Amino acid sequence: MAWQGIEGHDDVVEQFRRSLARGRLASTYLFVGPQGVGKHTFALKFAQTLLCAERPAELLDPCGYCPACMQVLAGTHADLLTIGKPPDRSEIPVQLLIGAGDRRMREGLCHDISLKPFMGGRRIAIIDDADHLNEEGANCLLKTLEEPPPKSVIILVSTSADRQLPTIRSRSQIIRFRHLECGVVADLLLAEQVTTDREEAQRLANYSEGSLVRARALADPELWKFRGELLKGLAEPRPDSLRLAKAVVAFVDEAGKEAPPRRMRARQLVGFAADFYRHLARRLNRAEPPADRELAAHVERAVATWPADDETAAACAERCLDALAHIDRNANQAVWIECWLDDLGRLVTGRAA
């Protein structure tokens, strides 16, 4: 059941419903979970719940039409503070937390959250992209969390609790958001008219890792065209790893200069490869071919000339999963892409160490 238009997080809704009913509102929350599953949207709706002038917060049902609710949606509510990483920066500037120059400690979120509420009964701060707090910024924020101002609520939005200082984790109530189910992602894509075709929406959802942001990014014809080239190369009995690596690096570079879109594209391609090898391993064990017709064609071609066994195909899929886990940790995309594809080639031809 959707809460305020947010799908897939009924357990989180119930957790907050119980807390509010018991009057146990924390001063700091740490929202953690995969990118693109609705954490920031949930934070805004929760802020709207706490600031709504027409309905008590215990109902967890903001009216949506009072001035306070409208201002939250418009980003103009005087008691709602939001900061995040600027698009052109790799970190959240410490100035957003404590001010700059001679205004240091007299401006910024840590100062502003300490002020008395202007309109509602609370002051609320949302720190988006909290993964990108640097050490100085995190330590400045910690001072506020250690002595939270009365009637204040701070929400940090992060992908993982491990990305925060232990001292911040210990002072926060951690709220975990899970991947969205594929059916939910497909329904949202159709509702947003990313596509009007149910089969296409399901295909995008299947590769989205439960993230609506990733599903939207998958709706790119050039991406699927390149997937065909990648799978054609992987289906060869002796993959040309160097040629494939050059092509993959070039395609990832086309995503732009910023790291997030490049990493997302890399994840997409590694995910395609992992799916190919999973289906290949199953097909070598006489399982049914995949429903995706293009993928099935590449798998059948590989089955006919595969120089190894199903365990090798499964090992290749596992190597792709290892690559997915390391994408965010590697600054040099070209190097890890070359290593990943070289490892696959060695596994297929029996040259692995």
Model regions and ranges:
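Clamp-loader machinery-focused feature within the broader ASCE/P-loop NTPase space
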Residues: A2-E136, R301-A304
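Charged, glycine-rich active-site and insertion segments that engage polyanionic ligands
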Residues: A2-T49, P150-S152, T159-F272, Y277-A353
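Arginine/glycine-rich "motif VI" loop of SF2 helicases in the C-terminal RecA-like domain
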Residues: A74, E147, V194
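Loop/turn-to-beta-strand initiation segments
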Residues: G120-I124, P149-I155
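Short N-terminal helix/helix-N-cap motif within the alpha/beta-hydrolase-1
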Residues: E135-A138, T349
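Conserved catalytic/switch belt of AAA+ P-loop NTPases
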Residues: N139-V153
